[in-house]
Amino acid sequence: MRQLFDEAGGGRGLLAVVAVVLLGGTAAAAADELKPYTATYNGIWHGMTVARSTLKLEQTGDTWTFSSRSEPRGIGRMASGVFPPLQVSVVRVTDKGVLPQSFKSSGGDAGKSVELNYDWQRHKVTGSYEGTRVDLPLTPRVQDDGSVQLGLMVELLQGHTPPNVQLIDKNSVREYQFTRDGEATIKTPMGDMHTVIFKSQKKYSPRITRFWCASDRGFIPVRVQQKRDDDVQWTLEIQSLSRQ
């Protein structure tokens, strides 16, 4: 999805779910609790199922690759900006925290492509974002559409409430605030799942994104939904989950 938090028409990417900041010395312990998995979701746009998305987390040492592949269904090509065909985020989880290394996204056409590279020695993130050159200072709070998801899971596995995040948007960053919003039992094809709900919102924005994270499945999101006032813009609903 594109523009997960605040843009009309959809999400920033299936990979992008909520905020993260660099963790302290407990991050490595949290990384031991992360587990590779594959999950599929139905992408629902204005009440219509328009995509099937596959989310995969893979590990090589302290490096994690988080990928999302979306296939259009029905009129899904109209919503390719909401559910991009491919997104790949590479991060390292170390005793210094969650460190994004690179991010790539194909948004359905060349003008929607994103490619970011992180240089932690120079504290710079560079690349291109939908045709805009990116050259930004790199701080622990800066994340991309993929690294935020791993940050969320690491925070929750440590029993922390995720903090605010600065998410890259072209050659700038936007700050989003989110809070815990209760608990709920969600019916899924795999059975009922207990979830913790978080909501995210940019200051003064009418859009709110909510995330239902399964507490007994490593806090993997089983539902994500964005609303503008009372109007549901889009929803992701989990269909299958295989976790190592």
What do the PLM-derived regions correspond to, one by one?
Residues R2-A16:
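Bacterial N-terminal signal peptides that target proteins for export
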Residues F5-D6, A31, Q143-D144:
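Intrinsic disorder/low-complexity signal
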Residues G13-G25:
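Bacterial N-terminal signal peptides
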Residues V21, V148-L156:
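Short, Φ-rich (hydrophobic/aromatic) sequence segments
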Residues G24-G25, G43, G127:
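Small side chains
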Residues A31-W120, L156-Q244:
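Acidic, serine/threonine-rich low-complexity disordered tracts
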Residues D109-G151:
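Hydrophobic, well-structured mid-protein blocks that either form specific transmembrane helices
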